[in-house]
């Protein structure tokens, strides 16, 4: 039963993360990126705050860490998530998911710089393989799809780097706050900031918002932003770090398959072949910790 629970949680997280990228693409079809991200967080925040109230979980970080809570709001939620959906206005959801599948590698690199963590030959080999493969995929896709493609890639890679740095800073500070505390208030204030900024700078026309885009932001907020977070946290508690990290190897396959099925678009054959060494590189980086 224990193994079944781990498998179910793993599949739920993989499906949630895999569908998130397609949902962001649909949301950005009629809603400006910044405003859509603000809507996403405003849908998620009340649910997270309600869960905190039910569990009697504090909303504020412990004294001495509350300035870092502001950092989380800006550099974990506001900027990276806006960059993600902005990036998807230029690149496919499948390619975006492949970029973010490299998160374990980005975290390893950030840990080397900010935490002075020791590494080994296999991890370094994995880093070289994965970075080279990802670079090959990006160059191949940018060669095929010119005109603004590079803007999306830069936005997504920037979001990846920022998330990796914030992760290492959380680890460095030995933050012991609960997953609800970590997400609730930063998510709420990020939603307010992005909704206000999006309304002022992007001038969204509510009359052109499609039902699909609105539903996608609701899905991103409530399902991916709340249910997905809780499932991944539960998976981390029950599974080994290695087992939980395998999600990063699975969710891009779901994202690419969904995009192919719904939009009929797929990354090039060369890029698909380069995914194989990318997965091997990520696997080596995770497994030989």
Where are these regions (language model features)?
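Juxtamembrane helix-loop-helix junctions in multi-pass membrane proteins
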Residues: 15-46, 92, 165-189, 203, ...
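Cytoplasmic-side transmembrane-helix entry/capping segments in multi-pass membrane proteins
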Residues: 64-72, 119-131, 153, 177-186
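Juxtamembrane helix-entry segments on the extracytoplasmic side of multipass membrane proteins
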Residues: 2-6, 30-34, 38, 61-67, ...
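Helix-helix packing/entry segments at the starts of transmembrane helices
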Residues: 37-39, 95-102, 168-191, 221-261
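Specific transmembrane alpha-helical segments of multi-pass solute transporters/efflux pumps
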Residues: 16, 20-21, 49-100, 136, ...
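Transmembrane alpha-helical segments that form core, pore/gating elements
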Residues: 48, 107-109, 113, 144-202, ...
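Hydrophobic transmembrane alpha-helices of multi-pass small-molecule transport proteins
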Residues: 48, 110, 119-141, 194, ...
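C-terminal transmembrane-helix exit sites in multi-pass transporters
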Residues: 49-56, 103-128, 252-273
């Amino acid at each position: 039963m224990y193994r079944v629970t781990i498998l179910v949680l793993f599949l739920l997280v993989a499906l949630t993360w895999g569908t998130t990228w397609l949902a962001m693409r649909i949301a950005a079809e009629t809603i400006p990126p910044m405003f859509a991200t603000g809507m996403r967080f405003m849908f998620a925040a009340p649910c997270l705050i309600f869960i905190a109230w039910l569990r009697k979980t504090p909303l504020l970080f412990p004294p001495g860490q509350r300035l870092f809570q502001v950092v989380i709001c800006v550099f974990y939620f506001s900027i990276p998530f806006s960059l993600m959906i902005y990036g998807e206005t230029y690149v496919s959801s499948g390619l975006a998911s492949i970029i973010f599948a490299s998160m374990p590698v980005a975290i390893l690199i950030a840990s080397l710089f900010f935490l002075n963590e020791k590494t080994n030959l296999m991890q370094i080999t994995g880093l070289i393989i994965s970075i080279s493969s990802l670079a090959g995929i990006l160059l191949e896709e940018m060669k095929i799809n010119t005109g603004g493609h590079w803007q999306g890639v830069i936005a997504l890679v920037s979001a990846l780097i920022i998330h990796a740095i914030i992760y290492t800073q959380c680890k460095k500070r030995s933050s012991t706050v609960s997953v609800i505390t970590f997400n609730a208030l930063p998510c709420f204030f990020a939603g307010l900031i992005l909704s206000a900024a999006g309304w002022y700078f992007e001038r969204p026309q509510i009359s052109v918002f499609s039902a699909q885009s609105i539903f996608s932001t609701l899905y991103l907020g409530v399902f991916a932003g709340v249910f997905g977070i809780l499932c991944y946290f539960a998976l981390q508690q029950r599974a080994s770090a290695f087992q939980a990290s395998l999600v990063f190897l699975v969710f891009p396959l779901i994202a690419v398959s969904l995009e192919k099925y719904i939009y009929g678009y797929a990354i090039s054959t060369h890029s698909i072949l380069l995914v194989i060494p990318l997965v091997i590189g990520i696997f080596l980086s995770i497994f030989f910790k």
